[in-house]
């Protein structure tokens, strides 16, 4: 079955796709409960295994995802949507750092670099200035979010780039992936 949707024949992949399509209560970022009607009740019920399926049905209706399924994961970009929320957040930040690595390499030591290191961490800065250039040709990507926080800036740049790449796979995939991230 998983070969038909472009994934290795492995039980774990089947489970990920099933959860992604039918059980948003499993992966929904907690902040979304604050924006849906009856969110406090849904939040409490989602922790009860007997009620989780009903909460998932409610969430699918609320987010207009009922009877829409993502079944084509042949493209590696589409598979990104199967990552959990924290992994997506790290991916977006690293992708943003990659897309701006030329700019970061030109920075001289100083206050801006220190604040950047504090925001994205020493590992993130090392990744952007030392490892990202080894990835080869980095696409020119024009998007600049309106934020002063470096971590948020790079995360938004990476998220925007991924969203553009994933747009071809349809709104149901993008919506479900978005539910894994903060509202």
Which residues does each predicted region cover?
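General marker for long, soluble alpha-helical cores
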Residues: 1-183
């Amino acid at each position: 079955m998983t070969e038909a949707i472009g994934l290795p024949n492995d039980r774990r992949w089947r489970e990920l796709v099933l959860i992604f399509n039918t059980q948003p209560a499993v992966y929904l970022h907690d902040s979304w409960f604050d924006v849906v009607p009856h969110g406090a009740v849904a939040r409490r019920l989602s922790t009860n295994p007997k009620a989780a399926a009903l909460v998932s049905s409610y969430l699918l209706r609320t987010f207009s995802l009922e009877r829409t399924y993502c079944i084509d994961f042949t493209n590696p970009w589409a598979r990104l949507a199967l990552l959990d929320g924290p992994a997506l957040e790290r991916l977006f930040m690293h992708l943003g750092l990659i897309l701006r690595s030329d700019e970061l390499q030109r920075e001289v030591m100083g206050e801006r670099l220190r604040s950047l290191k504090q925001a994205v961490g020493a590992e993130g800065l090392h990744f952007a200035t030392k490892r990202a250039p080894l990835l080869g040709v980095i696409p020119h990507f024009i998007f600049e979010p309106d934020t002063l926080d470096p971590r948020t800036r790079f995360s938004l740049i990476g998220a925007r780039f991924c969203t553009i790449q994933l747009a071809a796979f349809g709104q149901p995939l993008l919506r479900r992936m978005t539910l894994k991230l903060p509202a």
